[in-house]
């Protein structure tokens, strides 16, 4: 029995010795291969730790290995990607418009926040065929550098990229070499505004995008075929003083002395909200004009009341006009708001002039009436002398005089008619009576002409 056990141990030791010898032989072969190549790889270390297993080379499917392969194969990010036909690199663009804020009429600019997405093909970055066990795309970090279009915004005044919590940038490389670049940026853009119809105007603001250095021989920008411009949900109703009514995408290729440059343009149509100006400007100014007409019902002798009312309404209208103009830039043309304010001030000023005319006529009539009274007083003695020379028999024929009884209602009607006729014959009172009807009619006609001319830009009715 003991002899059998000893034999088994001897056989086992021989087998272990043979395996150890084989492992040493394989290790020497591995080191010799590594020394020939001049490198020591992770696969060699794995063979040393597991000498009894034959290593099998695994496909490079991890992102790190793919990136290491891409950026150690002579890739030069300073050179634009080559194309099959030698033409320009086609850059497909679409944008997500997130916010529009701070529409400044004085400086003619507005602020916008958007996500810009650009896509192009760089075959130097392709790393395999889809479906061979490799990922569909890899994401680059900030440290990696690849060729990118030199995109800029021609009508931009200020701009910055968002970096909280990390830079809001996405660079995705697909296995066929398609590159997707996405970035979130905020822009302050110039927007030339035409204020002829202010505050019922509709403005057209744009976002231009072009290449700064590459001409159309090198880069061609194209809008994405489907959904080139996307709007964030609720954007149209989030503007405080405007309403986003329409958007469109066009091309704006420019020709300069350095070449022809591809350009894309997004046009944003903004309609000003009229309700604010209706409550803050048009209704108060109408009330001021109507208040100025109250002086037509004052007695012509109420000079302090009529002057105070006219001057107060005129000064109030002037202050309102100054407040509106302080929110607008100085322009060389007449705006709709200028026509309205000018007409209202004209009506108020004419009401004040009407009182001056009435007062002048009344004073002139007073002087004439006083002179006529003095002449009548001077003629009374002469009439009395003539009366004494008339025969008394003329006044004794009382039987020929007939009396007509009048009731109170007929007497009042007669007196009112006499008083109205007297007022109409009084020129100063006649001017007040005409003004009471003429001013409202003229203001109503002006409103019809005004709203038919300027109201068509903004649906009011």
UniProtKB/Swiss-Prot annotation:
The chain crosses the membrane at residues 276-298, 304-325, 333-353, 433-454. L-glutamate binds at residues 98, 117, 182, 211. Glutamate binding is mediated by the extracellular domain. In contrast, the allosteric modulator ivermectin binds between subunits at the periphery of the transmembrane domain, proximal to the extracellular side. It is a multi-pass membrane protein. Belongs to the ligand-gated ion channel (TC 1.A.9) family. Glutamate-gated chloride channel (TC 1.A.9.4) subfamily. PANTHER family: NEUROTRANSMITTER GATED ION CHANNEL. GO terms for molecular function: extracellularly glutamate-gated chloride channel activity; glutamate binding; identical protein binding; transmembrane signaling receptor activity. Residues 21-275, 326-332, 455-461 are extracellular. Glycans are attached at residue 246. It comes from the Eukaryota. Residues 1-20 form the signal peptide. This is Glutamate-gated chloride channel alpha. Disulfide bonds join 191-205, 252-263. The gene is glc-1. Keywords: Cell membrane, Chloride, Disulfide bond, Glycoprotein, Ion channel, Ion transport, Membrane, Postsynaptic cell membrane, Signal, Synapse, Transmembrane, Transmembrane helix, Transport. Its main location: membrane. GO terms for biological process: chloride transmembrane transport; locomotion involved in locomotory behavior; protein complex oligomerization. It holds the Pfam family Neur_chan_LBD. InterPro entries: GABAA/Glycine_rcpt, GluCl_TM, Neur_chan_lig-bd, Neur_chan_lig-bd_sf, Neur_channel, Neuro-gated_channel_TM_sf, Neuro_actylchol_rec, Neurotrans-gated_channel_TM. Disruption phenotype: RNAi-mediated knockdown causes a decrease in the duration of forward locomotion in the absence of food, and an increase in the frequency of turns. Pentamer. Homooligomer, forms functional heterooligomers with glc-2. Residues 299-303, 354-432 are cytoplasmic. One of its GO terms (cellular component) is plasma membrane.
